[in-house]
Amino acid sequence: TDIKKAEAALIRRFQEEVSRFWDMEITSLSPIDTLSENMDIPLWNRLLKCLKNIAAERYDGILILHGTDTLAYTANLLSLLFAGTSIPILLISSNYPLEDRRANGYANFKGAVEAVGRGLPPNIYVCYRNRDGKTYLHLGSRLTQCPPGSDEFFSAGLPCFGEVSSSRLRLYQR
């Protein structure tokens, strides 16, 4: 399936690169395989059930591959239902298919893994690289939908929570 191919490509590329966290153990689950524009209540419930069944104490963080069309909705939903999570839960997406050279999906995946590896505090986040080349961490509860005609994400009412790169995790808010 497309989601399995994307997962494999992201993990393979990350492990091939030089990263302090290249050997991080990654467990993959695929409770949903649909375009995010097709998300509905039964699919969100399937995702929620999967997340509730994960033994959080076994993991440093959870990464959720998600489409951009309903990314802000899912991030806000998870922020409400998983408030008080004991580990960081990050949603990542790509503005284009991963094969497209303009795609930011790998940067978003890498940023999320780097953030978890560098001790990102528990919460719900979206890790997303905008056109300025910076990979931002947004609180899931603050993420807004992309402005019309744009593929960039922003935080409502506040600057983003932080920024992540291969060399550091910079948190603007605590």
Where do the model's predicted regions map?
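Active-site histidine-anchored catalytic micro-motif
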Residues: 1-174
